[in-house]
């Protein structure tokens, strides 16, 4: 999203989720996404990547990184969003194009250690759906205008949108109208196309 907003050209390479060798080779850690810059520097820390790409600080990433209290508040908010979202969406995500049988099994085995068996997550779907309204209401209350910081899109909006967007795969879930408009506005400004990478070529 951030690279689209900043109009940065980049080449995307989708790695199988069970590819541990490539991330460790580039960044000494299995974590995605990874960006390798023109000077050869590679990073898998999203805010570091965006701050480096955003030389003019248009998204305010450097300002957020410099404000420890605000950064902690954002981390807490994203944790509150992530818990029900991931529990709901992971059983759906494993059937999206980036997963083959091997990487799907790897993902399920790894995530089940933290969240429990995926078939039980699917059975608890209504419980997780019921956990969403208070979290979404909190997000709505934090928007001081069309966006988190008022009239201008900032890094906080991209962080929030990247966590919420996965809910669009849940058939039984529908965003409140104002949050849907908020997310779609971010998507438009960032030229974001979900799963664009997987449909560049005919199969």
Pin down the residues of each PLM region.
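GST-like fold's C-terminal all-alpha helical module
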Residues: 79-184
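Short, hydrophobic secondary-structure boundary micro-motifs
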Residues: 61-65, 148-151, 176, 195-198
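Acidic carboxylate-rich catalytic motifs and surrounding loops in phosphoryl-/glycosyl-chemistry enzymes
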Residues: 14-16, 153, 199
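Alpha-helical oligomerization segments
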Residues: 173, 182-203
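GST-like domain detector, emphasizing the conserved glutathione-binding G-site
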Residues: 1-106
């Amino acid at each position: 999203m951030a690279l689209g907003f900043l109009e940065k050209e980049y080449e995307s390479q989708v790695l199988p989720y069970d590819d541990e060798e490539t991330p460790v080779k580039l960044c000494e850690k299995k974590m995605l996404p990874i960006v390798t810059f023109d000077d050869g520097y590679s990073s898998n820390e999203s805010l570091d990547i965006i701050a480096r790409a955003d030389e003019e600080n248009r998204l305010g990433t450097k300002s957020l990184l410099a404000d420890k209290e605000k950064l902690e508040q954002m981390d807490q908010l994203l944790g509150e969003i992530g818990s029900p979202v991931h529990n709901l969406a992971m059983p759906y995500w494993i059937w999206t194009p980036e997963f083959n049988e091997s990487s799907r099994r790897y993902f399920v085995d790894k995530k089940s250690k933290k969240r429990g068996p995926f078939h039980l997550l699917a059975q608890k779907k209504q419980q997780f759906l019921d956990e969403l309204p208070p979290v979404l209401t909190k997000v709505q209350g934090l928007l001081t205008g069309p966006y988190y910081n008022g009239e201008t899109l900032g890094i906080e909006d991209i962080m929030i949108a990247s966590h919420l967007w996965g809910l669009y795969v849940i058939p039984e879930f529908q965003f409140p109208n104002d949050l849907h408009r908020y997310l779609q506005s971010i998507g438009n400004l960032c030229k974001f196309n979900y799963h664009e990478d997987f449909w560049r070529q005919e199969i």
